[in-house]
Regions:
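Conserved catalytic/ligand-binding micro-motifs in nucleotide and anionic cofactor chemistry
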Residues: 1-13, 17-325
Length: 325
């Protein structure tokens, strides 16, 4: 479930989630807890409230939602998730009629298949944009030397840009890796490091987008995981939103629970933009639960092909993704 530390003014100071609420809350009051910020919080705490949930994944999602809604002062993460930028192909306007790569915090749902992100900050988004722009050449290049990555040095066609943003990231990755190798051979290590960092920003955003796209494209998806004590955990996801969850008893037939969850789960209309109904953090959390090893897809409404990954997925470049900033 979810727990809240509250002040005398009934302000929520901190929100957390745990499998065993009693044990987790008790741990804050032991000698093992050394964090100064926690000690300060406990000095002003007058009560602890909890909300029980049928599954841990629902508790984690509720925790994210409460942090976004209540903005507790002691929680350091999950702040302002809806203001994180995406990289997409923007249509030109005014004096700039040609399409261009741009960052946006308002991404229409129908564009999620052709955008990458979200980025943790606008600065990282700009670094990823520079990496892509140096190859795709849709705008004026502001770099120096090694300007010609494309053999013809002409702007990419919009279709090629969309392909890069929707699963063929090697259109950018391959030329940039060649550039980084050339800089290293020339012993220009600082420049090679700069381009590696830019490529890493891009690949991490692509990897993040590839994880959440399947759930954002599904009007209804139900998945199941075996419980250690027996039985199943069932989760319903609609348009990237947790619509409901439940468990089944050990040895019980799970099919009635599947039917019950399908009919009792929250009704979710397709949102007009990404993040309108659920934060990307929520969708990412659900993607980790639904799509990783150990989960079984029970049912999917719509085209099941949305659950596939492109052959050229960003996860292929594990060395770049795993490298440090």
């Amino acid at each position: 479930g979810v727990y809240q530390f509250r002040s005398a003014a009934d302000q929520v100071l901190y929100v957390g989630s745990a499998v065993d609420l009693k044990r987790r809350v008790r741990s804050y009051f032991t000698a093992a807890e050394k964090r100064r910020q926690v000690a300060q919080m406990l000095d002003t705490t007058v009560s602890v409230r909890h909300i029980a949930t049928p599954t841990l994944i629902e508790a984690r999602v509720r925790e994210l939602r409460m942090i976004a809604e209540l903005d507790p002062p002691v929680n350091r993460r999950s702040r302002a998730p809806r203001r994180r930028p995406w990289l997409h192909l923007a249509q030109g306007s005014g004096s700039r009629a040609d399409p261009r790569l741009a960052l946006t915090t308002v991404l229409p749902t129908e564009e999620v298949g052709h955008a990458v992100g979200p980025f943790a900050s606008r600065g990282r988004g700009q670094e990823a944009l520079r990496a892509a722009e140096s190859v795709l050449r849709l705008g004026r290049w502001d770099g120096r030397e090694l300007r010609r990555v494309r053999h013809d040095d002409v702007p990419a066609e919009p279709a090629e840009v969309l392909a890069c943003l929707s699963g063929e990231v090697d259109l950018v990755t391959a030329p940039l890796l060649e550039r980084i190798a050339a800089l290293s051979r020339a012993e220009r290590y600082e420049e090679a490091g700069t381009w590696t960092a830019r490529l890493r920003c891009l690949l991490r955003a692509v990897d993040r987008a590839e994880r959440v796209r399947p759930l954002l494209a599904c009007p209804h998806l139900m998945a199941a995981r075996r419980r250690e004590v027996g039985g199943w955990e069932l989760v319903a996801v609609r348009w990237g939103v947790l619509a409901g969850s439940m468990t089944t008893a050990p040895g019980a037939d799970p099919r009635p629970a599947v039917e019950l969850l399908r009919t009792s789960a929250r009704v979710v209309d397709r949102p007009g933009r990404v993040g309108e109904v659920a934060s990307i953090e929520e969708t990412s959390l659900l993607a980790d639960w639904v799509l990783d090893e150990g989960a079984r897809i029970v049912e999917v409404d719509g085209d099941p092909a949305v659950l596939t990954w492109p052959i050229g997925a960003a996860a292929r470049h594990r060395k770049v993704l795993a490298s440090q900033e």
